[in-house]
Amino acid sequence: MNNSVKEKIKGGLVVSCQALSNEPLHSSFIMSKMALAAVQSGAVGIRANTTKDIKAIEEQVDVPIIGIFKNEYEGSEVFITPTYKEVKEICESGAQIVAMDATTRLRPHGEKLDEIIKTVRKEFPNILLMADTSSLEDVKYADALGFDFIGTTLYGYTEATTGKNISDNQFAYLKEVLKSTTTPIIAEGKIDTPEKAREVLALGCYSVVVGGAITRPQEITKRFINEMKKDHLGKS
């Protein structure tokens, strides 16, 4: 089962289908159709947020799902499947892979990531685990904990990495990540062009996750508008 799931996403595109509660596309039905469109176009997997969305997507597609549960807690910056409560819910949702924040930041309620991993391995032995990391330190931490996949998901999205992009300096950071571990690396985070997706696979990543550049029309529209405005700067 686990090897089958791994093989299905190897070398392919996983499309992240998510919409925040304040966005027009926030709907499990809409996300399920977004996932269907992605799979019909060749996506080998889907990344989805919340049990409700995951179950709706499962009814539409038959590909591996990377499940997460975004939840904010006071006193902690960790919000991607932050506590065992969310981890357990996603493990029971039907998702084959559960992704969670694997940074060294303080987790809600003082929970420890190593303890969460031990519990999951015991209670849900068939679930694959993906570490969402932001730094080489995180990658080494996740590697030591035995994650099945390590993602670059949070590089550029934490206080310490604000403004950084995975493609900076010819993907220098990603190259260091790939050198630091033999655990399969899933490139994710600011992979916003087909060229970047192709390059990260060429460098040795196991697979690639793309979200906003495919499934977030507001972000896509803003990119067009911002680029179009450049030609009009200084003109009256």
Curated annotation (Swiss-Prot):
It comes from the Bacteria. Pathway: Amino-sugar metabolism; N-acetylneuraminate degradation; D-fructose 6-phosphate from N-acetylneuraminate: step 3/5. It holds the Pfam family NanE. Signal peptide: none annotated. GO terms for cellular component: cytosol. InterPro entries: Aldolase_TIM (IPR013785), NanE (IPR007260), RibuloseP-bd_barrel (IPR011060). It catalyses: an N-acyl-D-glucosamine 6-phosphate = an N-acyl-D-mannosamine 6-phosphate. Disulfide bonds: none annotated. GO terms for molecular function: N-acylglucosamine-6-phosphate 2-epimerase activity. Its EC number is 5.1.3.9. One of its GO terms (biological process) is N-acetylneuraminate catabolic process. Belongs to the NanE family. NCBIfam families: PRK01130.1. Converts N-acetylmannosamine-6-phosphate (ManNAc-6-P) to N-acetylglucosamine-6-phosphate (GlcNAc-6-P). This is Putative N-acetylmannosamine-6-phosphate 2-epimerase. The gene is nanE.
